[in-house]
C-alpha cells in the first residue's frame, strides 16, 4: 500500500525544515547500496551535522518548490537519489561522503548545491580538500604568533646591537 497524502505532506515538511537549516546539499546515486552501507554513511555524517535522506524526487521537488535558494537542485532530481543535507561543517561532511564512496566504490556524487550555486564533482572535491575550520584557526594563530616573535626579536635587537657596538668600541679603546 502506498503512502497517504498526510504522510507525504509530513515528509515534504520535514524536508523543508532540513533544507531551511542546511548550508549545502549533495545528491548521490545510491543504487546498489545496502541498508547497512546507508546506515554507515549516516553514522559518518553525524559528526559533521550532515543528514542523509532517501526520498522520492517528486517529494523533494515539492519541498524545494518556491524556495529560490534550492531551486537549482531540481536539475539533479533524476534516478535514484540520496540527499545529503549539511549544516555546519561542510568540509567535514564532504570528506565523510568521499571517504564512504572510496570505501564502498558503489555510490557516486551527481552534484551539489552551495549558496544557490550548482557544484560540479570537481568543485565538490575541492571543498572536501579544504582544511577544517580548526586547522585554519591553528594556522592563523601560528602565523600571528610567528609575527609577534619576529617583532619582539627585532625590538630586542636594537639595544643589543647598540650594546655590542659600545662594547666593541670600549675594547678597541683599551688596546
From Swiss-Prot:
Q: Which GO terms describe its cellular component?
A: ribonucleoprotein complex; ribosome
Note the Pfam families from the entry: Ribosomal_L10
* Disulphide bonds in the chain: none
Q: What GO molecular functions are on record for this protein?
A: large ribosomal subunit rRNA binding
Q: Name one GO biological process term.
A: translation
Q: Which InterPro entries match?
A: Ribosomal_uL10, Ribosomal_uL10-like_sf, Ribosomal_uL10_bac, Ribosomal_uL10_bac_type
Q: Does the keyword Protease apply?
A: no
Q: Which UniProt keywords apply?
A: Ribonucleoprotein, Ribosomal protein, RNA-binding, rRNA-binding
The UniProt family comment states: Belongs to the universal ribosomal protein uL10 family.
What the entry lists under HAMAP family is as follows:
Ribosomal_uL10
Q: What does this protein do?
A: Forms part of the ribosomal stalk, playing a central role in the interaction of the ribosome with GTP-bound translation factors.
Subunit structure as annotated in this protein's UniProt entry: Part of the ribosomal stalk of the 50S ribosomal subunit. The N-terminus interacts with L11 and the large rRNA to form the base of the stalk. The C-terminus forms an elongated spine to which L12 dimers bind in a sequential fashion forming a multimeric L10(L12)X complex.
What name does this protein carry? Large ribosomal subunit protein uL10
Native organism: Prochlorococcus marinus (strain MIT 9313)
Amino acid at each position: 500500500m502506498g503512502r497517504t497524502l498526510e504522510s507525504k505532506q509530513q515528509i515534504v515538511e520535514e524536508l523543508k525544515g532540513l533544507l531551511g537549516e542546511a548550508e549545502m546539499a549533495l545528491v548521490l546515486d545510491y543504487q546498489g547500496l545496502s541498508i547497512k552501507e546507508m546506515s554507515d554513511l549516516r553514522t559518518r555524517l553525524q559528526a559533521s551535522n550532515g543528514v542523509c535522506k532517501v526520498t522520492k524526487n517528486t517529494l523533494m521537488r515539492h519541498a524545494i518548490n518556491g524556495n529560490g535558494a534550492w531551486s537549482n537542485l531540481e536539475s539533479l532530481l533524476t534516478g535514484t537519489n540520496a540527499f545529503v543535507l549539511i549544516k555546519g561543517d561542510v568540509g567535514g561532511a564532504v570528506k565523510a561522503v568521499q571517504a564512504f564512496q572510496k570505501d564502498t566504490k558503489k555510490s557516486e556524487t551527481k552534484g551539489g548545491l552551495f549558496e544557490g550555486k550548482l557544484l560540479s564533482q570537481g568543485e565538490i572535491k575541492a571543498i572536501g580538500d579544504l582544511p577544517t575550520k580548526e586547522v585554519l584557526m591553528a594556522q592563523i594563530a601560528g602565523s600571528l604568533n610567528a609575527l609577534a616573535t619576529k617583532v619582539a626579536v627585532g625590538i630586542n635587537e636594537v639595544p643589543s646591537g647598540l650594546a655590542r657596538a659600545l662594547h666593541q668600541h670600549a675594547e678597541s679603546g683599551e688596546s
